[in-house]
C-alpha cells in the first residue's frame, strides 16, 4: 500500500450522526477529484441522512496528507446537513479549472467549503452532464428521498433549480 490513514472523522457514538436510526453512521462515499486542477486528490465522505462529512487527501512524498475537512456537525442550520447522497461525483461545475464534489443536494467547492446547497434533503440518485445542450454549462438531475420528495434539474454552477416536480 502507498499509505494509510485513520478514517476521518471517526465513528464515535451513533447518536453523534444526527439520529440513532439504522446505520446512519456507517454510510460512506468516495471519489477522486482534481481539486487543484492538475493532481488527483482522494475525497472520502461519511453520512448523508443527517450529519455529513467529507475529507480530502493529497499524495505528498508517498504519504496521504489532509487537504481539508468538511463537517456539518449536528447543526441542522449548516448547509449540507441532511443534504447528502448515496454517491458522489467530481466535476468542474463553476469553470475555474478545479473540480468540485457533488453529493446530492450539496456541492462542495475545491477548497472544502459549500459552493451551494439545495436544502431538499438526501437524494438517492443523480446524473450530471450537459443535459440541456442549448444552455451553457452543466446540469444536475437529482431524485430526492426526503419530503417533499420529487426530482430537480439544477444549474450545477450555482445550485439554481431550473425545474422541480414533487
Q: For the regions a protein language model found, what residue spans apply to each?
A:
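Beta-propeller-forming repeat regions
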Residues: 1-166
Amino acid at each position: 500500500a502507498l499509505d494509510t490513514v485513520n478514517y476521518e472523522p471517526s465513528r464515535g457514538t451513533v447518536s453523534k450522526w444526527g439520529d440513532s436510526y439504522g446505520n446512519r453512521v456507517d454510510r460512506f462515499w468516495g471519489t477522486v477529484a482534481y481539486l487543484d486542477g492538475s493532481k488527483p486528490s482522494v475525497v472520502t465522505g461519511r453520512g448523508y441522512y443527517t450529519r455529513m462529512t467529507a475529507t480530502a487527501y493529497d499524495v505528498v512524498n508517498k504519504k496521504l496528507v489532509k487537504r481539508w475537512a468538511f463537517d456539518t456537525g449536528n447543526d441542522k442550520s449548516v448547509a449540507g446537513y441532511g443534504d447528502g447522497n448515496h454517491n458522489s461525483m467530481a466535476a468542474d461545475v463553476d469553470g475555474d479549472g478545479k473540480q468540485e464534489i457533488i453529493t446530492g443536494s450539496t456541492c462542495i467547492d475545491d477548497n472544502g467549503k459549500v459552493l451551494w446547497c439545495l436544502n431538499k434533503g438526501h437524494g438517492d440518485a443523480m446524473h450530471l452532464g450537459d443535459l440541456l445542450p442549448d444552455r451553457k454549462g452543466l446540469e444536475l438531475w437529482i431524485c430526492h428521498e426526503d419530503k417533499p420528495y420529487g426530482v430537480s434539474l439544477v444549474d450545477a454552477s450555482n445550485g439554481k433549480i431550473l425545474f422541480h416536480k414533487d
